[in-house]
Amino acid sequence: MTALLIDGNALSKTLRTQAAQRAAALTARGHQPGLAVVLVGANPASEVYVRNKIKACEDNGFFSQKDAYPDTLSEADLLARIDELNHDPKIHGILVQLPLPAHIDSHKVLEAIAPEKDVDGFHVANAGALMTGKPLFRPCTPYGVMKMFEAHDIPLQGANAVVIGRSNIVGKPMAMLLLEAGATVTICHSKTRDLAAHTRQADIVVAAVGKRNILTADMVKPGATVIDVGMNRDDAGKLCGDVDFAGVKEIAGHITPVPGGVGPMTITMLLINTIEAAERAAAAA
């Protein structure tokens, strides 16, 4: 059995078309959705991510601006800039590209973003609200994964789900969203004693640790849905995920590729969150 491919590019295209329609409707009412992306330093990977986010905005009728600063920028100056963006009516979403230089406290910076403009969903107010099932914004990557389940009619209620990874960005919020959808969730991580014992019981596995081949074919239950959030390079320098794709696709029922799986969905859900922020602001105006 070869797994059905969950195509993140195709689903992203559909969702971005919907986002563009909502953006056009808002713009016609004088409320063009606006995203500010803040980049500190010259991390090449971060520059690519920021460029992709800005392009996605431009392609879909959003206003966007990039604030790029040298890595010598002080924490105080960055916090002052975020405060300005919090009060800028043209800006509905603020995204600070991580990682930040070592001298800047990323927690303090993320907490400085107004919760109603926290389109990454990382502010403690939104992270806490996720626990109660009522967040203003869901973090983009887990939100995108949930849309993939929905698009492919993958049943979550009563399913055994394993999330490999416990980061605040993917692992923990992913577990919360699966729990909210009625799955029985296990979070595995670097201290988990027997990872395979957990994954072999799972109907759904989400791998999000940034480690090649953390999940191999012998660790997967036949017919399981496998979501690969990882972004790594193989020995030849080619992009790959956390899952041994060639082996696992022969066992799983559904699987996401890398590239072309979860990656495109992350930026798409950033657009959706920004639209929702703009719609709330327009309703309150």
From Swiss-Prot:
Oxidoreductase as a keyword of this entry, yes or no, is: yes
> Which molecular-function annotation in GO is an example for this chain?
methylenetetrahydrofolate dehydrogenase (NADP+) activity
Instruction: Alphabetically list the UniProt keywords.
Output: Amino-acid biosynthesis, Histidine biosynthesis, Hydrolase, Methionine biosynthesis, Multifunctional enzyme, NADP, One-carbon metabolism, Oxidoreductase, Purine biosynthesis
Under the heading HAMAP family, the entry gives: THF_DHG_CYH (MF_01576)
Protein name listed in UniProt: Bifunctional protein FolD
Q: Name one GO cellular component term.
A: cytosol
Task: Spell out the InterPro entries in the cross-references.
Answer: Aminoacid_DH-like_N_sf, NAD(P)-bd_dom_sf, THF_DH/CycHdrlase, THF_DH/CycHdrlase_cat_dom, THF_DH/CycHdrlase_CS, THF_DH/CycHdrlase_NAD-bd_dom
E.C. number? 1.5.1.5, 3.5.4.9
Subunit-level organization: Homodimer.
UniProt record, GO biological process:
L-histidine biosynthetic process; methionine biosynthetic process; purine nucleotide biosynthetic process; tetrahydrofolate interconversion
Gene behind this protein: folD
Q: Tell whether NADP is among the UniProt keywords.
A: yes
Q: Where does NADP(+) bind?
A: G165, R166, S167, S190
Instruction: Report the function annotation for this chain.
Output: Catalyzes the oxidation of 5,10-methylenetetrahydrofolate to 5,10-methenyltetrahydrofolate and then the hydrolysis of 5,10-methenyltetrahydrofolate to 10-formyltetrahydrofolate.
Annotated NCBIfam families? PRK10792.1 (NF008058), PRK14186.1 (NF010783), PRK14189.1 (NF010786)
Q: In which pathway does it act?
A: One-carbon metabolism; tetrahydrofolate interconversion
Organism, by scientific name, is: Burkholderia ambifaria (strain MC40-6)
Catalysed transformations (reactions): (6R)-5,10-methylene-5,6,7,8-tetrahydrofolate + NADP(+) = (6R)-5,10-methenyltetrahydrofolate + NADPH; (6R)-5,10-methenyltetrahydrofolate + H2O = (6R)-10-formyltetrahydrofolate + H(+)
Q: Would you identify the family this protein belongs to, as annotated? A: Belongs to the tetrahydrofolate dehydrogenase/cyclohydrolase family.
